[in-house]
Structure formats: C-alpha cells, structure tokens
C-alpha cells in the first residue's frame, strides 16, 4: 500500500525519466554485432574469354576471431583460379580481401560463400569462435558475357 502511495506521489517528470530509461535499455539490447560483413565485387559484363577478377572483402564486428573458408560457386563450370578456396583467421581489427582470376565465354551466376569453420592452426593460439545461429554467408552476382 505504501508503494502505491509513493507511486502516485511521484512527479510526472520522474515517471517520464523512468519510462525513457526503460526504452533506452531496450534499444541498446537491439544493437547487435554483425557476424560477417561482405562486399563481393565482379564486373557486370565482360567479353568472351576475357580474364575476370572477382574480389571478396570480408570483415566482422565480433570481438572474437573466427576461422573462415571462402570460395566461389557458379551456375556453369569455370576453369582457372575460380576453384581456389581460401582459409583465414578473421578478426575485428584485421579484415581480409580474397581474389579470384578466371575466364568465361557465357553469362554465369556466381555466389561468393563464406563459411565459419572449426579448424586448428589458423588463428593464433587456436583461439576462435563459431557462431551458433549462422555459419554460412553468401551473396550472388550475375556476370554477363557480351
């Protein structure tokens, strides 16, 4: 009963302050870090059998490091460096950029894939985390052949 009397005596300014603090706390909880941030860059169009360079820049907002494996997948088989797979230690303060050079003579859809994996000997002292929710990230682009 005494608590209710105190509540009704509280000034509107105090009640507004408590409400704002509650809303601010909820908003701060929604501010989550991104596991993987990727930027996949390939030309929109090329001539037949012209060399293509694909670039994938990867970074994280997590405080912990992760072991990542990056590779490309295409809608049609491609030759050359297209089939290279890279494994690296990805940390917040050390983003990575990966490159692939290949040739194609027809239009192709290409997916750049980043898998967070468990592998020893990649990160210093083998200190790396694996996200529980997602461990595969990808983006798809189309390369037109004129």
Curated annotation (Swiss-Prot):
Family matches, as Pfam families: SVA
InterPro entries (alphabetical): Ig-like_fold, Ig_E-set, PIP
Region forming the signal peptide: 1-28
Glycosylation sites: 105
GO biological processes: proteolysis; regulation of immune system process
Keywords, ordered alphabetically: Disulfide bond, Glycoprotein, Pyrrolidone carboxylic acid, Secreted, Signal
Molecular-function GO term, any one: aspartic-type endopeptidase activity
Disulfide pattern: 65-91, 89-123
Cellular component terms per the entry's GO annotation: extracellular space
Pyrrolidone carboxylic acid modification, residue list: 29
Primary location group: secreted
Compartments (UniProt record): Secreted
UniProt subunit comment: Monomer. Interacts with AZGP1.
Family indicated by similarity: Belongs to the PIP family.
Protein name, as recorded: Prolactin-inducible protein homolog
Taxonomic placement: Eukaryota, Metazoa, Chordata, Craniata, Vertebrata
Gene for this chain: PIP
């Amino acid at each position: 009963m005494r608590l209710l009397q105190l509540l009704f005596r509280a000034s509107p300014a105090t009640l507004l302050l408590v409400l704002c603090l509650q809303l601010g706390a909820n908003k701060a909880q929604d501010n989550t870090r991104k596991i993987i941030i990727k930027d996949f860059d390939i030309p929109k169009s090329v001539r037949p059998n012209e060399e293509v360079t694909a670039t994938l820049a990867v970074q994280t907002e997590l405080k912990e490091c992760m072991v990542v494996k990056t590779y490309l997948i295409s809608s049609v088989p491609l030759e050359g460096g297209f089939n290279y797979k890279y494994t690296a230690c990805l940390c917040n303060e050390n983003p990575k950029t990966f490159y692939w050079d290949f040739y194609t003579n027809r239009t192709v859809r290409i997916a750049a894939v980043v898998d967070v994996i468990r592998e020893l000997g990649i990160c210093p002292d083998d200190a790396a985390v694996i996200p529980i929710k997602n461990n595969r990230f990808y983006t798809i682009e189309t390369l037109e052949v004129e």
